[in-house]
């Protein structure tokens, strides 16, 4: 994944999963063929990101990454 249209690279997005305060929840609105998840966490660059992903064969597959919205920031902060 190159730098996405949201200005977040795959490499930066992957660092969110190392955030001990990251929050992950199911994303039923986008789970059609497989269960999708949405994770909010701080990247190594210090940016709060929203990561859409699936867990496939014990591997996290990132679908998209973007800067978190103010509402998503609240979810993260309330943990």
Question: PLM ranges: what are they?
Answer:
Residues 1-79:
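Ribonuclease/tRNase effector modules and their secretory precursors
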């Amino acid at each position: 994944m190159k730098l996405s249209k949201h200005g977040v690279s795959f490499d930066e997005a992957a660092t969110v999963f190392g955030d001990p305060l990251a929050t992950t929840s199911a994303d039923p609105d986008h789970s059609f063929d497989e269960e999708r998840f949405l994770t909010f966490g701080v990247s190594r660059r210090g940016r709060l990101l929203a990561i859409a992903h699936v867990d496939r064969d014990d591997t996290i597959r990132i679908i998209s990454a973007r800067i978190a919205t103010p509402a998503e920031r609240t979810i993260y902060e309330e943990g």
